[in-house]
């Protein structure tokens, strides 16, 4: 079969939000982070940084801002930061103008961070650890900037809580592949397809389900985004 160990690992991913009280050895963290660093990056700029949080005090302070149990329980919490602070230092060797403000800079930094983040999670899972990516940190950008001393030209993109798993979930059903991968040109989905996927998701979630998949889309995108994200980006000179 063409199923490698790598593919098996990738296809069996599920988020882990509960962890045992066990540390991740430094050696394992080093290997995980070296794997993260080899992710593809735009022009090799490496426009992200990682803040490794292991002190319980820091994790608790973060939990106060972003009350996700995975943060408190994690052996290590990794904050992925979109980062053009190094870029500014490099660019200023050659130019007096540094103008990273705008959408392109945000895309470059967040894509770089995301690719490194996915490598991080896969490397950790390959060593038997589990984790969850937490995007909610963006809603507390200003507070996190203070907590982690984030300078100009940086912003939190997401965090990853890592640890020894204390729970096991079934793999969450994704959309049928042909509704996500289109041969040669885009095909818009029918309302029926969305409703069918609502049913698949409801079946998977069972008693835990409080809203449908499409209801969650309405909650996320039915209103203007919170102003805090934009305000922090402006404050950090990225917008």
Each language-model region and where it sits:
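Acidic, surface-exposed loops and disordered segments
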Residues: 1-239
């Amino acid at each position: 079969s063409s199923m490698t160990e790598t593919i098996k690992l990738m296809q069996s991913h599920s988020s882990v939000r509960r962890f045992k009280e066990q540390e991740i050895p430094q050696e394992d963290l080093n290997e995980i982070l070296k794997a993260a660093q080899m992710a593809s990056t735009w022009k090799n700029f490496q426009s992200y940084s990682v803040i490794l949080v292991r002190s319980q005090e820091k994790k608790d302070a973060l939990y106060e801002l972003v009350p996700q149990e995975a943060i408190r329980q994690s052996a290590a919490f990794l904050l992925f930061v979109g980062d053009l602070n190094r870029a500014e230092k490099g660019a200023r060797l050659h130019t007096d103008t540094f103008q990273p403000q705008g959408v392109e800079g945000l895309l470059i930094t967040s894509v770089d961070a995301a690719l490194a983040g996915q490598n991080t999670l896969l490397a950790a899972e390959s060593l038997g650890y589990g984790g969850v990516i937490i995007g909610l940190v963006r809603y507390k950008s200003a507070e996190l900037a203070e907590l982690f001393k984030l300078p100009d030209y940086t912003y939190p993109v997401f965090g990853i809580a890592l640890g020894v798993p204390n729970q096991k979930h079934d793999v969450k059903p994704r959309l049928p592949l042909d509704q996500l991968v289109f041969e040669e040109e885009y095909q818009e989905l029918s309302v029926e397809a969305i409703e069918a996927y609502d049913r698949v998701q409801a079946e998977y979630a069972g008693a835990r389900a409080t809203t449908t998949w499409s209801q969650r889309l309405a909650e996320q995108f039915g209103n203007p985004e919170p102003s805090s994200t934009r305000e922090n980006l402006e404050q950090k000179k990225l917008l």
